[in-house]
């Protein structure tokens, strides 16, 4: 497989980083973030695709008890249309009580499908244990499953996970430090000392010297007005200032599981000669049965016939001259017919030899 397409896409990604970008595209305001919510609930109304586990029965009995219906402790309800689920949602910053959230509903037990089910009222809690939203409603399930009496089964997508658009109502807000203090802090999404300095300089050019100062490679602190309305206008102006991020350091990123290789445009090679030969050993086993004539009194014998074939690829050596660029590397690799797995071995060897100018990252 040729790797030109992957490398060409990488060139576009790395070259795009050199153009000016708005602050809002490269940094976040510290403290302004979403919060994860989670809850435990029941889905009812399933067409026989629910579950009959002990904890499902216990949850079902607890729900009935909350409605004033008490069942004997030794009674086991026969329920096939109920499933226990985990309900999760992301709560954006500044969302207010009465607004709604999309929720994801995932089966916790052995339910075959959640299609056709309805989530009953479920409390969604934050990491502090407080309830921030309440979810309820009919689910949208994209997957489905069907099973025959002979055990045959058809499953498409994931029938045990569903979504409820606007399925949760926010009951409580999350406090943010946005409206407190004398400063705002921008956190870069990709930490870089040069970019942090450029961001601070761009703000100081607009507002005046000393208004912004970089704290480290990822954070820039800006003096801000105390009045909330002024702070909103202040931030609306700052987030649209354009900053040219520093170019990325030379990197080669390799996914050893998929064979994907991404090479940055600044990667260079020192003089090196590379040859990559492949030795292939193929062993084929065939089983033969010797069945004698019934009247001969012989025994049936099972024998194995092994065939071993050894072949070695006739690959050529290629030479990297000083300052070899990405394009030249791609042409050289394709010339010898190397697959992505072969390229990984070549890059690792070049890095060990000190001939690869760039960081080799294997994920």
From Swiss-Prot:
GO CC list: bacterial-type flagellum basal body, distal rod, P ring; outer membrane-bounded periplasmic space
Signal peptide: 1-20
Domain of life: Bacteria
Pfam families reported in the protein's UniProt record: FlgI (PF02119)
Keyword RNA-binding among UniProt keywords: no
One Gene Ontology term from the biological process aspect of the record: bacterial-type flagellum-dependent cell motility
Membrane-spanning segments: none
Cellular compartment(s): Periplasm; Bacterial flagellum basal body
Keyword list, A-Z: Bacterial flagellum, Periplasm, Signal
Single annotated GO MF: structural molecule activity
Function: Assembles around the rod to form the L-ring and probably protects the motor/basal body from shearing forces during rotation.
Subunit annotation: The basal body constitutes a major portion of the flagellar organelle and consists of four rings (L,P,S, and M) mounted on a central rod.
Family per similarity comment: Belongs to the FlgI family.
NCBIfam families: PRK05303.1 (NF003676)
Name the record gives this protein: Flagellar P-ring protein
Organism: Shewanella loihica (strain ATCC BAA-1088 / PV-4)
